């Protein structure tokens, strides 16, 4: 569902022409699943000062100075969805590093947490930030053209985690 008055840009690359300054930061993101295994995603605002505006992405955000990442995610989910969780209810899944040395900056981490919401339905979630929210089956979500690419990769890893775990233990692919 989209927030009241929200609209998605039809131009498939308009954000690429923006001259707005982007400010990389350490960040956290939720691989947020409902009991039916759909992933809950945020339609990002059209603000040109954020990475991938007008794209579907994971809920989450910047880690504040001195803040543990798990607590940052708990805070962000409260702000963005009015969901109250404890750090014990979020499980670290993976972490990506981004090297912004080309811009005179350093490494920035994006830490992904698996979060199950068995007691929630997407209709019961309250959007506090972003242009919209929706729940998607993994196959549909990963086939969509306007998904934040690094979030899409983390979602694919989460969805395929059983296959990846088997391969890392040395199992051979029968194909």
Enumerate the predicted regions with their spans.
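Unchanged
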Residues: 62-87, 94-150
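Conserved Nudix-box catalytic region and its N-terminal flanking loop in Nudix hydrolases
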Residues: 38-79
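Acidic, metal-coordinating catalytic segment for phosphate/diphosphate chemistry
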Residues: 2-31, 35
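Short, glycine/serine-rich, charged loops/turns that create anion-binding
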Residues: 32-37, 46, 97
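Short connector loops at helix/strand junctions that flank enzyme active sites
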Residues: 25, 53, 58, 106-110
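Nudix hydrolase/Nudix homology domain
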Residues: 48-49, 53, 122-175
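Short secondary-structure boundary/capping segments
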Residues: 22, 31, 47-48, 103-105, ...
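Conserved hydrophobic "DFG−1" position in protein kinase catalytic cores
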Residues: 32-33, 41, 135
């Amino acid at each position: 569902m989209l927030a009241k008055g929200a609209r998605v840009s039809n131009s498939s690359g308009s954000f690429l022409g923006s001259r707005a300054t982007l400010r990389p930061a350490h960040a956290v993101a939720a691989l947020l699943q409902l009991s039916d295994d759909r992933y809950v995603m945020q339609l990002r605002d059209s603000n040109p000062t954020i990475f991938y505006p007008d794209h579907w992405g994971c809920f989450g955000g910047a880690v504040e100075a001195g803040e543990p990442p798990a607590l940052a995610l708990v805070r962000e989910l409260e702000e963005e969805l009015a969901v109250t969780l404890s750090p014990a209810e979020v499980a670290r899944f993976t972490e990506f590093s981004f090297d912004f040395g080309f811009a005179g900056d350093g490494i920035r981490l994006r830490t992904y947490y698996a979060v199950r919401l068995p007691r929630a339905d997407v209709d019961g979630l309250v959007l506090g930030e972003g242009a919209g929210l929706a729940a998607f089956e993994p196959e549909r979500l990963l086939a969509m053209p306007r998904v934040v690419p690094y979030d899409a990769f983390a979602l694919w890893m989460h969805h395929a985690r059983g296959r990846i775990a088997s391969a890392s233990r040395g199992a051979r692919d029968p194909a």
